Amino acid sequence: MSQTRYFFTSESVSEGHPDKVADQISDAVLDDFLRQDSSSRVACETFVTTGQVIVGGEVTTKGIVDIQTIARKVVTEIGYTKSEYMFEANSCGVLSALHSQSPDINRGVDRKEEIADEFDRVGAGDQGMMFGYACTETPVLMPAAIQFAQHLMKKLAEIRKEGKIMTYLRPDAKSQVTLEYENEVVKRVDAVVVSTQHDPEPEGVSEAAWQEVIKNDIIENVIKVVIPADLIDENTKFHINPTGRFVIGGPHGDTGLTGRKIIVDTYGGAAPHGGGAFSGKDPSKVDRSAAYAARHVAKNIVAAGLADKCTVQVSYAIGVARPVSIYINTHDTAKHGLNDAQIQEKAELIFDLRPAAIIKRFSLNKPEGWCYQQTAAYGHFGRDIFPWEKTEKVGELKSALNLA
């Protein structure tokens, strides 16, 4: 095999990033609707800016949700609790513009009872294609760059909320990790970027000196804690708040909208994306549920040792339960003499990708031990609390391919 060397980069953002504030509010609203009425149809979008939250969208439900209370609770949990942030939980305006879902859409999703198979009664909420991916780069079968980027943001938030060190931290932050690969294997971390919102420099301390304190703290307490030491060398570059001062941030610094961080939510650019966002959508929307199912298929294929990498694409027509197409690609990493067609044939028999089957398999309309708000920061994949991360189909796949 010829030597192949390349660099690959993924980014993440904190729970206090404006777009993620919006995602979390949308999913918290969804959670409350589903708690009251598990058959709720929800498409909830949130807009956040200086001192203002606007929640809009379409809903069909028997539930009654207090948008004001939910939005303020989410903003409080994130940490926007000081007036100097210019976006504060108790004082920001909250406007609700939710209204009824179009009956034209609903008639295609909820089919007639006389259809014999219960899983054929629920059509896809829209057309589109969704992707799932898994690889052997990390124990959770996720690409390494996005995992490191997510964990940097989680660690930074953990430190901020504990309040024991780095007490100058504010909620908004971003990370980016560049890895060097050789023969498809991660060899080292080439660069790490962390930009974090912070308090102004203390009186008598220069901006340059303050930024040096922040840089050293981030490197020692965040980067070196998250990233394995054997991947960092003397040539690894650390870019900490590279533009300097980052005091103004959050929704006051940038407007936030639901659904603008779809690559952060998934695989960090290591796999294709169908374009549909997740947050604020109930599981009848295949943008969300089918993407979770596609990840489940890909992860089980890799966990079964059938391949080192796997991409799954599934597509739907609105109102039609069965997928229009299914495509599986193992990127020339299939094992045991298998090819993609053989793997796909068995996968299609084992994994039912009709929306109602997906919803039932993962209890997506009645989450147990998790909630949608949890998915809205730090990634929807690679986290064991979510049911689509289970690898319970490994034995069935192996048996079907005579590998058990």
Curated annotation (Swiss-Prot):
UniProt-listed InterPro entries: ADOMET_SYNTHASE_CS, S-AdoMet_synt_C, S-AdoMet_synt_central, S-AdoMet_synt_N, S-AdoMet_synthetase, S-AdoMet_synthetase_sfam
Enzyme superclass (EC): transferase
Record-listed K(+) binding positions: 45
CDD domains: S-AdoMet_synt
Main location: cytoplasm
UniProt catalytic activity: L-methionine + ATP + H2O = S-adenosyl-L-methionine + phosphate + diphosphate
Annotated GO biological process: one-carbon metabolic process; S-adenosylmethionine biosynthetic process
Subcellular compartments: Cytoplasm
Ribosomal protein among keywords: no
Key words, A-Z: ATP-binding, Cytoplasm, Magnesium, Metal-binding, Nucleotide-binding, One-carbon metabolism, Potassium, Transferase
UniProt remark on cofactor binding: Binds 2 divalent ions per subunit. Binds 1 potassium ion per subunit.
Pathway: Amino-acid biosynthesis; S-adenosyl-L-methionine biosynthesis; S-adenosyl-L-methionine from L-methionine: step 1/1
EC assignment: 2.5.1.6
Gene3D superfamilies in the cross-refs: 3.30.300.10
UniProt GO molecular function: ATP binding; magnesium ion binding; methionine adenosyltransferase activity
Residues that bind Mg(2+): 19
Residue positions binding ATP: 17, 172-174, 245-246, 254, 260-261, 277, 281
Region (Flexible loop): 101-111
Stored NCBIfam families: metK
Protein family: Belongs to the AdoMet synthase family.
Function in brief: Catalyzes the formation of S-adenosylmethionine (AdoMet) from methionine and ATP. The overall synthetic reaction is composed of two sequential steps, AdoMet formation and the subsequent tripolyphosphate hydrolysis which occurs prior to release of AdoMet from the enzyme.
PANTHER family referenced in this protein's UniProt entry, alphabetically: S-ADENOSYLMETHIONINE SYNTHETASE
Subunit relationships: Homotetramer; dimer of dimers.
Record protein name field: S-adenosylmethionine synthase
Species per Swiss-Prot/TrEMBL record: Pelodictyon phaeoclathratiforme (strain DSM 5477 / BU-1)
